[in-house]
A protein has these predicted regions:
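Short, solvent-exposed loop/hinge segments that bridge or flank secondary-structure elements
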Residues: 29, 33-68, 72
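Contiguous, well-ordered beta-strand patches that form the walls/edges
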Residues: 60-112
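Sec/Tat signal peptide C-region and signal peptidase I cleavage site
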Residues: 17-22
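Sequence contexts marking disulfide-bonded cysteines in secreted/extracellular proteins
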Residues: 38-40, 94-96, 132-134
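Short, exposed beta-strand-loop hairpins at the edges of beta-sheets
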Residues: 107-108, 115-128
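Bacterial N-terminal signal peptides that target proteins for export
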Residues: 1-8
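Bacterial N-terminal signal peptides
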Residues: 8-16
Length: 135
């Protein structure tokens, strides 16, 4: 998977949420794993909360949301803007890794307190489900 693909998958998430949606941002704080993957294989619990077991792994499908920052596999995302339309949120993210810096748009929908759906605004029929990890 190339770096742009990693940026896209890493994010996502969630992105989410920014200063304009504090209640939603609060609801998305924490560690999340892509549907079908085990939290134990992605995260470990530490004295400071959850951390990646191996963040550099190209097989990592997890996200950690702290404040307006989203940590994904190999990249970090900062929520720049957020807009709500019905039950869906769209976010503009500033993304960076050790080599590339860029912007990304992502949309998502909270399905329950422990589950959300991420999709590209241009292709809402293609989505990924994330589940909250509570180790």
């Amino acid at each position: 998977m190339n770096r742009i693909g990693l940026l896209w998958s890493g994010l996502i998430v969630l992105a989410a949420v920014g200063h304009a949606c504090a209640a939603t941002l609060d609801a998305l704080q924490g560690a999340w794993a892509m549907n079908g993957t085990g939290c134990e294989s992605i995260f470990k619990k530490t004295g400071r909360g959850m951390e990646f077991r191996d963040r550099d792994s190209s097989l990592n499908t997890g996200l950690i949301i702290k404040g307006s920052t989203i940590l994904g596999p190999l990249a970090t995302f900062k929520v720049a803007q957020i807009r709500r339309k019905g039950d869906r949120l769209s976010a503009a993210l500033n993304c960076s890794d050790s080599i590339i810096y860029g912007n990304l748009a992502v949309s998502f929908r909270i399905l329950s307190p422990n589950k959300f759906e991420r999709y590209a605004p241009e292709f809402p029929e293609i989505s990924v489900i994330y589940n909250r990890c509570n180790l």
